[in-house]
Amino acid sequence: GTPCGESCVYIPCISGVIGCSCTDKVCYLN
């Protein structure tokens, strides 16, 4: 639920390495 300050429209979340995932074109952490 916390925005990771990253979008994932064209590329996956780089912040995925710390647990962020793509939701509605924005990377979120829980």
Swiss-Prot record:
Keywords, ordered alphabetically: Disulfide bond, Knottin, Plant defense
PTM text: This is a cyclic peptide.
Record SUPFAM superfamilies: Cyclotides
S-S bonds: 4-20, 8-22, 13-27
Residue location of crosslink Cyclopeptide (Gly-Asn): 1-30
Pfam annotation, one family: Cyclotide
One BP annotation, GO: defense response
Family the UniProt entry places it in: Belongs to the cyclotide family. Bracelet subfamily.
Function: Probably participates in a plant defense mechanism.
UniProt protein name: Kalata-B5
